[in-house]
Amino acid sequence: MTLQQEIIQALGAKPHINPEEEIRRSVDFLKAYLKTYPFLKSLVLGISGGQDSTLAGKLSQMAIAELREETGDNALQFIAVRLPYGAQADEQDCQDAIAFIQPDRVLTVNIKGAVLASEQALREAGIELSDFVRGNEKARERMKAQYSIAGMTHGVVVGTDHAAEAITGFFTKYGDGGTDINPLHRLNKRQGKQLLAALGCPEHLYKKVPTADLEDDRPSLPDEAALGVTYDNIDDYLEGKTLDSAIAKTIEGWYVKTEHKRRLPITVFDDFWKK
């Protein structure tokens, strides 16, 4: 088995999907989890206005609405969380995503004060954060807020990670990577677009340039610029297609060096890092 085949198998990626079937699969997955643990009453997700959170948010709201109808439990709710750092550049996209999702509840937590306070406390301890590390601080502060909300609402934190993100480790460890349940796992980027199109999402929300937008020095830096490959390259790789060897090596390089992000804390029984 080639490394490409191993990666595809590990991430559960498929070359072709039926969007309607995958929508149903994700919704049923979320419902089944909540049914298994009836003390859980909410799904909590940060909404950025980008493709991934818009899709995960819509699937979460659908799952909650169906489960509420089936069980008669009106305590069930989907909580969409706005998590801007100061003013958000693409605020209108975020509002459009909220309008499309129609969440039961919307909360806004501006993380800027918390991030700056943490940065100042570290500075007083003699640690000056780089812009890159500050970006990770933002991602972790956003996740901290979501878990606080989930803790107070008997909730589960929903993740937006998918195969095209997982393969490159393009997420912050214990930030946007630290979630409870990931309904998009297995899908590549273009497949996520297919699901949103099938759900009637406004096109501009899934055709916009993907960006983590974490760094102050490089605002709205496109994911593809940070990775050195395009999402089309990554999707083609995950679909088993043959790529230019340099591109394939770049993707595989990201996969190998970010393996630690796809695992729980390393123990004495783990040896993947020795390879």
Curated annotation (Swiss-Prot):
Keywords on record: ATP-binding, Ligase, Magnesium, Metal-binding, NAD, Nucleotide-binding
GO cellular component: cytoplasm
Transmembrane recorded as keyword: no
InterPro entries according to UniProt: NAD/GMP_synthase, NAD_synthase, NH(3)-dep_NAD(+)_synth, Rossmann-like_a/b/a_fold
Binding residue positions for ATP: G46, I47, S48, G49, G50, Q51, D52, S53, T160, K189, T211
Residues noted as binding Mg(2+) in the record, renumbered to the chain: D52, E165
NCBIfam families: nadE (TIGR00552), PRK00768.1 (NF001979)
Assembly and oligomerization: Homodimer.
Official protein name in the record: NH(3)-dependent NAD(+) synthetase
